[in-house]
């Protein structure tokens, strides 16, 4: 991602699991782009608002139960014309498999998909990989 960015732009990544820091930070620091990437350890719901960022692109790959909350938070800071990418929106087919209707993560993804589908502020599509 950083390779395709314009000079002066940056990536801010939020990681709630501090155990991931020891694994991830050396990769970031040894990449060709360390000044462009900020890794913030902690809860995005507490840390993002005081940062007052304008977001061009957000990538959601977090607790599936909270995708709706991540979306609503990010929308407050997303610039006009910005993008939100969300991982696992098909959740390995679980979102259409009735056997997973009571699974909390599947419910979270379904709620997210329904919210985005109904949100007239955004253009949307699912790109299955």
What are these regions (language model features)?
Residues 1-129:
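S-adenosylmethionine/decaboxylated-SAM
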């Amino acid at each position: 991602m950083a390779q395709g960015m314009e000079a002066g732009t940056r990536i801010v990544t939020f990681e709630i699991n501090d155990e991931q820091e020891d694994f991830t930070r050396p990769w970031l620091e040894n990449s060709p782009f360390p000044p462009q990437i900020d890794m913030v350890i902690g809860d995005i719901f507490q840390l993002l608002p005081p940062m007052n960022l304008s977001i061009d692109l957000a990538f959601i790959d977090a607790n599936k139960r909270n995708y709706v909350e991540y979306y609503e938070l990010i929308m407050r800071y997303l610039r006009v014309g910005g993008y939100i990418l969300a991982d696992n929106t098909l959740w390995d087919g679980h979102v259409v498999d009735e056997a997973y209707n009571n699974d909390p993560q599947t419910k979270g993804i379904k709620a997210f998909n329904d919210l985005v589908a109904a949100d007239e502020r955004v253009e949307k599509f699912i790109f299955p990989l």
